[in-house]
């Protein structure tokens, strides 16, 4: 029986033979075009707002077909490096926070579908918004607190309309996310709520009315604590609220499964 020689296995000759047996995957033409155009944009050969050459000109320049050019431009659009409008040449743009977060959307939705995925995202939301309310209690201006109060008022007017209440609920929490003035916070928050709401079960409206009223009262407690400049109280109020929301939707989801 042959003995295993780790030094022989790791010798350059053996590694070299192994690599020769594993040919590198060739890049698609569209990927090569994408990379070259991206580098040209980053080198400022095409400035922000400037149009790229036409598809026909790009085909001639890179010596590729139209599908390769279109795939490359579509990839650059997903990265936020170009904007594409029907009938116009692609125009160079600057990636935004929304673009960055949007790239994660597909992976996030896949993760939500895994066992425990929703609970993990709810915990992420709790950690994130906990920091937001503490910041708001310590730093929000009077004008920002007034915006929270206006969002709360709209919240109160939509208790009997579930679709409107969900929108006003999201708007209330969005105002919280905007208080630090960081566009990345806002983009993360918008995406996080979109992902969680999309993952919620479909339930009859009548089962949500009581939940709406409870959420509204909890929103009041959050705003009151922020007005009092009490970050600990604001954090407790928020955690009570989000834990209640999670428990309610978990219970509604279980009911929905039993009825099927």
UniProtKB/Swiss-Prot annotation:
GO terms for molecular function: DNA binding; DNA-binding transcription factor activity. CDD domains: WHTH_GntR. The keyword Ribosomal protein does not apply. GO terms for biological process: negative regulation of DNA-templated transcription. Residues 27-95 form the HTH gntR-type domain. Residues 55-74 bind DNA. InterPro entries: GntR_C (IPR011711), TF_FadR/GntR_C (IPR008920), Tscrpt_reg_HTH_GntR (IPR000524), Tscrpt_reg_NanR (IPR023730), WH-like_DNA-bd_sf (IPR036388), WH_DNA-bd_sf (IPR036390). SUPFAM superfamilies: GntR ligand-binding domain-like, Winged helix' DNA-binding domain. The keyword DNA damage does not apply. Keywords: DNA-binding, Repressor, Transcription, Transcription regulation. PANTHER family: HTH-TYPE TRANSCRIPTIONAL REPRESSOR NANR (PTHR43537:SF53), TRANSCRIPTIONAL REGULATOR, GNTR FAMILY (PTHR43537). Transcriptional repressor that controls expression of the genes required for the catabolism of sialic acids. Belongs to the NanR family. This is HTH-type transcriptional repressor NanR. It comes from Citrobacter rodentium (strain ICC168). The gene is nanR.
């Amino acid at each position: 029986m042959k003995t295993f020689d780790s030094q022989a296995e790791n010798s350059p000759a053996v590694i070299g033979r192994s690599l020769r047996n594993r040919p590198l995957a060739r890049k698609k033409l569209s990927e090569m075009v994408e990379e070259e155009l991206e580098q040209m944009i980053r080198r400022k050969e095409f400035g922000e707002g400037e149009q790229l050459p036409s598809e026909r000109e790009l085909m001639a320049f890179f010596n590729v077909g139209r599908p390769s050019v279109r795939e490359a431009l579509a990839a650059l659009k997903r990265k936020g490096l170009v904007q594409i409008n029907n009938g116009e040449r692609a125009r160079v743009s600057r990636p935004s926070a929304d673009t960055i977060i949007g790239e994660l959307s597909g992976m996030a939705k896949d993760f939500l579908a895994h066992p425990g995925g929703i609970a993990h995202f709810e915990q992420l939301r709790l950690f994130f918004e906990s920091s937001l309310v503490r910041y708001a209690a310590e730093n929000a201006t009077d004008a920002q607190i007034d915006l929270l109060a206006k969002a709360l008022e709209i919240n109160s007017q939509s208790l009997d309309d579930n679709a409107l209440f969900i929108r006003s609920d999201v708007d209330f929490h969005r105002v919280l996310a905007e208080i630090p003035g960081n566009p990345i916070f806002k983009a993360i928050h918008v995406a996080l709520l979109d992902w969680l709401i999309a993952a919620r079960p479909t339930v009859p409206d009548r089962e949500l009315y009581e939940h709406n009223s409870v959420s509204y009262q909890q929103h009041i407690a959050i705003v009151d604590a922020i007005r009092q400049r009490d970050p600990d109280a604001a954090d407790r109020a928020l955690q009570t609220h989000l834990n209640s929301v999670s428990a309610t939707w978990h219970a509604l989801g279980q009911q929905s499964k039993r009825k099927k």
